[in-house]
């Protein structure tokens, strides 16, 4: 029986894009190949809530060291030597340098090498001495967009033809909710009837600071979803509404209820927040950088990442033009329907089969 270990150590809420990717594959690949054994690798603290649903379906085993900790590499090698899989899928940039077995690695982007603000000596050394050499010896490599294929190829010296592009998906739970749900959400969260949503984090490349000079002059309040303390860290004043991390059900309502969803990140390997917002009918304004042009296409407004006035003008257009909002909402839903986690899982399983010499 073929045994495949899938790395799930980064799945701990609130889910960022890479964690959601790993979780969705672990949900969807095993039923496609019932004759294989799939095992999920989790951290030393055991099974987080987000993985509880998987426990009855696939075994979850612990790695004795934290994700990206100093002891991670020997602990990861020990866990894999104990499991003896035919294949290990490294679903993030944490690859097993001390385990020589068959590897499939997903390299989502190269931001720690490409961006000055994300670069450090430690990260550069890790990517150049660990990630790059081990990835070049992998059985197969996956990335999530044509943008990322170019970035990973350039910064890790990997031939672009070795990187198969398999796009992320969007779960069916991200859908256009009824107005009654939106009214209830606004009431529970103390939100006005009309607002602009901005999503990201305080990381520099998420670029939420571009909205700081214009936030007070927007035609509707700005609601920030970027982690606790982000408002102060990014220099926004008290007029900005800050939300704590939302469960998926309320994230859907946050997207759907916004006059516009502002996603100013200038370096995204894929851009899952923009895709999920479109699936919920939220009109999207995204930076014209990274993978956003690939993912959003003509279904949203793409504006220069670093131009506050361009963001203000786009927001004003959405606020004033009902037809534009309706058009972008419909186009976004249609665009998002082209991205499926089931399709991602099926294509990834084909990568496994080829890596094992089965096709």
Question: Where do the model's predicted regions map?
Answer:
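Carbohydrate transferase catalytic cores enriched for Leloir-type hexosyltransferases
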Residues: 1-359
């Amino acid at each position: 029986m073929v045994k495949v270990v899938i790395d799930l150590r980064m799945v701990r809420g609130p889910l960022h894009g890479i964690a959601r990717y790993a979780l969705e594959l672990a949900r969807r690949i095993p039923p496609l190949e019932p004759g294989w054994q799939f095992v999920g690798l989790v951290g030393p603290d055991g099974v987080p809530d987000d993985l509880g649903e998987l426990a009855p379906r696939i075994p979850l085993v612990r790695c004795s060291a934290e994700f990206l900790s100093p002891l991670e590499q020997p602990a990861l090698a020990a866990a894999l030597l104990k499991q003896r899989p035919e294949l290990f899928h490294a679903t993030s940039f944490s690859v097993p340098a001390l385990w020589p077995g068959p590897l499939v690695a997903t390299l989502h982007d190269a931001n720690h090498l490409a961006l000055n603000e994300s670069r450090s000596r430690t990260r550069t050394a890790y990517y150049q001495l660990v990630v790059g050499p081990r990835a070049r010896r992998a059985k197969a490599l996956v990335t999530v967009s044509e943008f990322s294929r170019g970035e990973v190829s350039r910064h890790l010296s990997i031939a672009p033809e070795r990187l198969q592009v398999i796009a992320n998906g969007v779960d069916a739970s991200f859908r256009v909710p009824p107005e009654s749900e939106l009214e209830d959400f606004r009431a529970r969260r103390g939100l006005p009837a009309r607002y602009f949503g901005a999503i990201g984090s305080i990381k520099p490349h998420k670029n939420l600071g571009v909205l700081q000079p214009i936030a007070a002059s927007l035609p509707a309040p700005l609601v920030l979803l970027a982690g606790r303390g982000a408002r102060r860290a990014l220099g926004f004043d008290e007029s900005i509404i800050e939300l704590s991390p939302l469960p998926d059900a309320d994230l859907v309502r946050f997207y759907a209820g916004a006059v516009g969803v502002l996603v100013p990140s200038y370096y995204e390997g894929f851009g899952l927040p923009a895709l999920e917002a479109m699936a919920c009918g939220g009109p999207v304004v995204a930076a014209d950088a990274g993978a956003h042009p690939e993912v959003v296409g003509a279904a949203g407004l793409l504006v220069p990442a670093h131009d506050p006035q361009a963001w203000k003008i786009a927001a004003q257009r959405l606020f004033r033009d009902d037809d534009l909002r309706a058009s972008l909402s419909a186009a976004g839903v249609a665009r998002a329907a082209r991205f499926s986690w089931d399709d991602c899982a099926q294509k990834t399983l084909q990568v496994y089969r080829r890596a094992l010499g089965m096709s």
